[in-house]
Amino acid sequence: MNPEQFQQALADHGITLSAEQMQQFADYYQLLVETNEHVNLTRITEKNEVYLKHFYDSITGAFAEPRLESEDLTLCDIGAGAGFPSLPLKIAFPQLKVTIVDSLNKRIAFLEDLVAKLGLTGVTLIHDRAETFSAKTSPYREKFDIVTARAVARLSVLSELCLPAAKVGGEFIAYKASAAPEELQQGGTAIKQLGGKVQKTVTLTLPGTDEERNIIVIDKIKATPKKYPRRPGLPSKKPIQ
């Protein structure tokens, strides 16, 4: 997917990118590839692949939750790595107020450079572990309209890291590959215990490929019990069963 195809694929979904926004994506790609030579940010570096599997893939969250396109929502991205999905969403929908949490200082440093280079406002970067970011005494607990994660961790683990940050009435949007139905089945208990309820799963295929993606939207219907999230490392070591 080259930049023009990227722009057209989004236009097909009613999302229009200006020349300025397209330039922001071009600058994002450039800095990502340059920084990746000395900081491990991504194994995907070929231009067309980045536009498809990072930029386009990130924005598909808006296909599942159209409010991202126009409402002044607060969005928290847990473990964003090189900024996915939150920064492509922010470029496409500048009214979003974005908070990014990542546990690696090198990634936060890259994101600081990137946000400055792209001239983005309304972006807060926090160096922290997810478990302490939304712990029971944290000012960020249950504060966000939308919490996103695009990570390889199982849904039962991601839910414990993400649902505590979503406000009651908010949503957790999980970006998953093709194993989503299986993960939903295994993660059902965790989602319920953490105050969530699965609203829907939107399944799509990345254009020009047979790669399946699943966007899982989980409503936060009640407050998360104070004992969650558990201490760092425990959610992945002993997922809620």
Swiss-Prot record:
It is found in: Cytoplasm. Its EC number is 2.1.1.-. Signal peptide: none annotated. GO terms for molecular function: rRNA (guanine-N7-)-methyltransferase activity. It comes from the Bacteria. Keywords: Cytoplasm, Methyltransferase, rRNA processing, S-adenosyl-L-methionine, Transferase. GO terms for cellular component: cytosol. CDD domains: AdoMet_MTases. InterPro entries: rRNA_ssu_MeTfrase_G, SAM-dependent_MTases_sf. It is an enzyme of class 2 (transferase). S-adenosyl-L-methionine binds at G79, F84, A130, E131, R150. Specifically methylates the N7 position of a guanine in 16S rRNA. Belongs to the methyltransferase superfamily. RNA methyltransferase RsmG family. This is Ribosomal RNA small subunit methyltransferase G. It comes from Limosilactobacillus reuteri (strain DSM 20016) (Lactobacillus reuteri). The gene is rsmG.
